[in-house]
Design a protein with these regions (language model features):
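Bacterial N-terminal signal peptides that target proteins for export
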Residues: 2-12
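Bacterial N-terminal signal peptides
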Residues: 11-22
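Boundary at the C-terminal end of the N-terminal hydrophobic targeting segment
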Residues: 23-27
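Structural signature of tandem-repeat unit edges
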Residues: 32-40, 58-66, 84-118, 128-141, ...
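Short, T/G/N/S-enriched strand-turn elements that build extracellular solenoid repeat scaffolds
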Residues: 43-53, 69-79, 326-334, 394
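Consensus positions within tandem repeat domains that build extended binding/scaffold surfaces
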Residues: 120-125, 143-148, 166-171, 189-194, ...
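Residue-level detector of functionally pivotal "anchor" positions at catalytic/ligand-binding pockets or at interdomain
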Residues: 367-390
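C-terminal tail/sorting-segment detector
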Residues: 401-417
Length: 417
């Protein structure tokens, strides 16, 4: 009888233990419930988790100071060791909101070591299994390639104190669909968001003064982008392959657009360049096949080679420059010479016709570059011809912009409502 009771008690105990474990472990043995570990001293995380359990935890929260030793352990749990070899780690969700990164410990990635309040270079590089990450509140900087290749990351919370995002910081984080950039950020490095094809919208902080080289290459999902007023330069390759962009408002202070800056942005339909623009770089808008209308400001002096090559959808170009800009080779190759009409300031027709504009375009029309007239009230002149913005002859006023030629030889751009 005693043996039967003992056996029954043992089975009951085992049942209770298995029931408790089921709260933490999934069918595949992974621990899905958040595990919270509070560290009394930096560098002690490896002492708190056994070598077996570290590969079973999928959701981890750390409280306290962490250094390079701890970060190396976290990387192993997230699928990559310190020399970027893959591990059996399955960590998916990481909450460091109550943690503080401090200097010290061993290297976490080759020769990379932790610094106080910095997400260091390549801190989470290659950890593609991470899906959600909350950073420590005190972080001020995100280093080079810090999240490079974290393609599974869909949720990332950046603390308010960050002022700098370095080169390649979010390189190919293709799973990110949105990201709130703190207002205090003043620098975004080269290729910082290259390959973030999942991003659909992004608002850059007011302190940003330039778009760095290659910062948004192949962000093909980006449909909306808000650029701060303080930006003065868009560097080369900044938005190559951002085919989802349909419209873009460039800040008034921009003076230069770098080479290949918007190459392959085939979704853009119209573009007005700010008055301060003087130079358009080589291949800046190459392959923007969706572009139908282009406005070049009065101060434009140079249009780089192949700048608008392949912009096959262009039907109208308004040039406000009294002095004909210098045009590089093949600047408008691929634009339909018959379909596209170039509108130039009054009195400059001959200059433009004799220039490279006359080589690329058959239809050059003078217009009043001083502004848009809503109506024509003068009784001294009569309308003799009317055209649409793409150069087609109109028999009557048509809603939208009309190009009207008068008996005194003047041409005006008229808005018809």
């Amino acid at each position: 009888m005693k043996q039967i009771i003992k056996k029954g008690s043992f089975l009951t105990l085992m049942f209770l233990l298995l029931g408790c474990l089921s709260l933490y472990a999934a069918d595949n043995g992974l621990i899905t419930k958040q595990i919270t570990i509070e560290l009394e001293k930096a560098g002690t995380l490896p002492d708190r988790i056994t070598s077996i359990k570290k590969y079973e935890i999928t959701n981890l929260k750390i409280i306290g100071e962490i250094n390079g030793t701890d970060l190396r352990m976290i990387r192993e749990m997230a699928g990559r060791d310190y020399i970027s070899n893959s591990t059996d780690g399955k960590l998916s969700v990481l909450d460091l909101s109550k943690a503080k990164i401090v200097e010290g410990g061993v290297c976490y990635y080759y020769d990379c070591y932790t610094s106080n309040d910095v997400i260091g270079d390549r801190a989470f590089a290659g950890c593609s299994g991470l899906t959600s990450l909350t950073l420590p509140a005190g972080i001020t900087k995100i280093g080079d390639d810090a999240f490079g290749g974290c393609s599974g990351l869909t949720s990332l919370t950046l603390p308010a104190g960050i002022t700098e995002i370095d080169d390649g910081a979010f390189w190919y984080c293709s799973g990110l669909t949105s990201l709130n950039l703190p207002a205090g950020i003043t620098y975004i490095g080269w290729y910082a968001f290259e390959g973030c094809s999942g991003l659909t919208s992004l608002t850059l902080p007011a302190g940003i003064t330039r778009i760095s080289r290659g910062a948004f290459i192949d962000c093909s999902g980006l449909t909306s982008l808000t650029l701060p007023a303080g930006i003065t330069e868009i560097e080369p390759w900044a938005f190559i392959g951002c085919s989802g962009l349909t419209s873009l408002t460039l800040p008034a202070g921009i003076t230069k657009i770098g080479s290949d800056a918007f190459r392959g942005c085939s979704g853009l339909t119209n573009l007005t360049l700010p008055a301060g623009i003087t130079e358009i770089g080589y291949s800046a808008f190459y392959g923007c096949s969706g572009l139908t209308s282009l406005t070049l400001p009065a101060g434009i002096t140079w249009i780089g080679g192949e700048a608008f090559r392949g912009c096959s959808g262009l039907t109208s170009i308004y040039v406000y420059a009294e002095k004909v800009p210098i045009i590089g080779s093949n600047a408008f190759t691929g634009v339909d010479a018959k379909k596209c009409t170039v509108y130039v300031p009054m009195g400059t027709y001959n200059d433009y016709w004799l220039s490279d504009f006359g080589y690329y375009f058959e239809n050059i029309v003078e217009f009043d570059a001083t502004g848009i007239d809503k109506t024509t009230t003068s009784t001294d002149v009569e309308e003799v011809a009317r055209y649409s913005v793409n150069g087609q002859r109109l028999s009557a006023p048509t809603k939208g912009l009309n190009i009207v030629k008068y008996s005194d030889g003047s041409v005006k751009k008229v808005a018809v409502r």
